[in-house]
């Protein structure tokens, strides 16, 4: 069966313009306009998705099948083009019968054209085929538009679902444009409203605990690099290519109706020299219905500017991924559990903003892993937030899992973060020795987020930095009073 892409090629129908018009109509829809006004950071993320939309639409048009009736009519038209005028006259009754049987839009016009002329001349033969082709072009264009409209509705539905999800999570997870872009990419998964409301809930809890958010910001950016620009920078010539519309079109892009004499198709010019069709030619010229070539072009010019040469001395400090271990023992339940989950959500926010990875491991008797910054980060975050802290404490297994993870090349500059009340047994000597080796030889940093003031000093001594967030009632009341 004939594909739509083949039909467009045969009839010189350009689908590019229709795809662009559909994309522009989608971007101008009221839903997207309101969304962009409310969440300006996500506008760039959605705009960056446009090439993927275009490719999906082109693929849909390329793979679409032409209806059997239209396929049969196109094949008949192609065969008719090969016939001479006497041969065409012999085949004309069968052609008219075929058009009538297929309910072709051209059937009535073809019948009228033959009945109104007693003699079927070569000029009439040319006109018959020309109008038949025009009818096929209209049918092909209509088919393209119908498919694009179906795709537009589906695409708009998908975009609205992603906009709803991204709009709900943007205040919690999108700190800058980079985070907004990654959040938009994550929203492509199949999620229901009830699922991501858990992230919204912990986002609201995090907003009510600004000290927790501030702690995550300090920990996440404690290794930020510093750059010092040099003074008296010399000027350098900078050349760029600037695209400008060409004054002289240079490429055939299809066929259109118009009155441009210089771009007429040869069959149209042929009718001008036939006495019987001369008035028909002028009528179509006045009504701008003559078939003409559609041309376009572009030009590039070199723009020369000068700018200072900027050299910077950078104090290189790695800002690698987070490996976060969360204690899920019974002593970490209640308010501690809420704080631990909200703190991980805050680290996820920092990771998205700085284009870093955020890997979560839960430790009690077993180790459960989640990656919050991957393509399925939102689903992983929901699963993590759905966990209940009711196990025991095996902090040694947590450290062994961290050490094993840091052996991989992609984690060579990772920071380890352990969230616990640190009320546990002492660490084995081999674990302490291995952690010290990672700190000395590979510059890995180990952070402790202590949720209690009663953590064992023997355990916490191995950490590079201890971030304290006491969840006791007295500390909670003091924090609220200071606000």
Curated annotation (Swiss-Prot):
Its main location: cytoplasm. Keywords: Chaperone, Cytoplasm. It comes from Salmonella typhimurium (strain LT2 / SGSC1412 / ATCC 700720). Signal peptide: none annotated. InterPro entries: Uncharacterised_CoxE (IPR008912), Uncharacterised_ViaA (IPR023481), VWF_A (IPR002035), vWFA_dom_sf (IPR036465). It holds the Pfam family VWA_CoxE. The gene is viaA. This is Regulatory protein ViaA. GO terms for cellular component: cytosol. Component of the RavA-ViaA chaperone complex, which may act on the membrane to optimize the function of some of the respiratory chains. ViaA stimulates the ATPase activity of RavA. Homodimer. Interacts with RavA. The lineage of its organism: Bacteria, Pseudomonadati, Pseudomonadota, Gammaproteobacteria, Enterobacterales. Coiled coil: none annotated. Belongs to the ViaA family. It is found in: Cytoplasm.
């Amino acid at each position: 069966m004939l594909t739509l892409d083949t039909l467009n090629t045969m009839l010189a129908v350009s689908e590019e313009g229709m795809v662009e018009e559909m994309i522009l109509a989608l971007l101008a829809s009221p839903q997207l306009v309101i969304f962009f006004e409310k969440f300006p950071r996500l506008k760039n993320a959605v705009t960056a998705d446009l090439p993927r939309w275009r490719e999906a639409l082109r693929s849909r048009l390329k793979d679409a099948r032409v209806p059997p009736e239209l396929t049969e009519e196109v094949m008949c038209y192609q065969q008719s083009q090969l016939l001479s005028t006497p041969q065409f006259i012999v085949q004309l009754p069968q052609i008219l019968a075929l058009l009538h049987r297929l309910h072709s839009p051209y059937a009535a016009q073809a019948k009228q054209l033959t009945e109104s002329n007693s003699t079927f001349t070569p000029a009439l033969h040319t006109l018959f085929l020309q109008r038949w082709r025009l009818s096929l072009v209209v049918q092909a264009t209509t088919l393209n538009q119908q498919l694009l409209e179906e795709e537009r509705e589906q695409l708009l539905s998908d975009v609205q679902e992603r906009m709803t999800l991204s709009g709900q999570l943007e205040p919690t997870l999108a700190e800058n444009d980079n985070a907004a872009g990654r959040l938009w990419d994550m929203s492509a998964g199949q999620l229901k409203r009830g699922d991501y409301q858990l992230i919204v809930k912990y986002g609201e809890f995090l907003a009510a605990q600004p000290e927790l958010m501030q702690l995550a910001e300090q920990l996440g950016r404690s290794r930020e690099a510093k750059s010092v620009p040099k003074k008296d920078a010399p000027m350098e010539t900078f050349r760029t290519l600037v695209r400008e519309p060409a004054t002289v079109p240079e490429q055939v892009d299809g066929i259109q109706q118009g009155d441009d004499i210089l771009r007429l198709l040869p069959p149209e010019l042929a009718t001008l020299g036939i006495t019987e069709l001369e008035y028909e030619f002028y009528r179509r010229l006045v009504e701008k219905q003559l078939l003409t070539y559609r041309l376009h072009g572009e030009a590039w010019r070199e723009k020369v500017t000068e700018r200072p040469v900027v050299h910077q001395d950078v104090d290189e400090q790695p800002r690698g991924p987070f490996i976060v271990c969360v204690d899920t023992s019974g002593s970490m339940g209640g308010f501690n559990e809420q704080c631990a989950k909200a703190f991980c959500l805050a680290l996820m926010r920092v990771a998205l903003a700085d284009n870093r990875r955020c890997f979560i491991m839960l430790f009690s008797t077993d180790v459960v892993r989640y990656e919050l910054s991957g393509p399925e980060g939102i689903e992983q975050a929901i699963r993590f937030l759905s966990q209940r802290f009711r196990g025991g404490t095996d902090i040694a297994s947590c450290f062994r899992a961290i050490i094993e993870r840091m052996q991989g090349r992609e984690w060579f500059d990772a920071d380890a973060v352990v969230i616990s009340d640190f009320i546990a047994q002492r660490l084995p000597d081999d674990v302490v020795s291995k952690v010290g080796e990672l700190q000395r030889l590979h510059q890995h940093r180990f952070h402790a987020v202590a949720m209690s003031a009663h953590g064992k000093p023997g355990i916490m001594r191995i950490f590079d930095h201890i971030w304290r967030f006491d969840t006791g009632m007295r500390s909670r009341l003091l924090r609220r009073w200071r606000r």
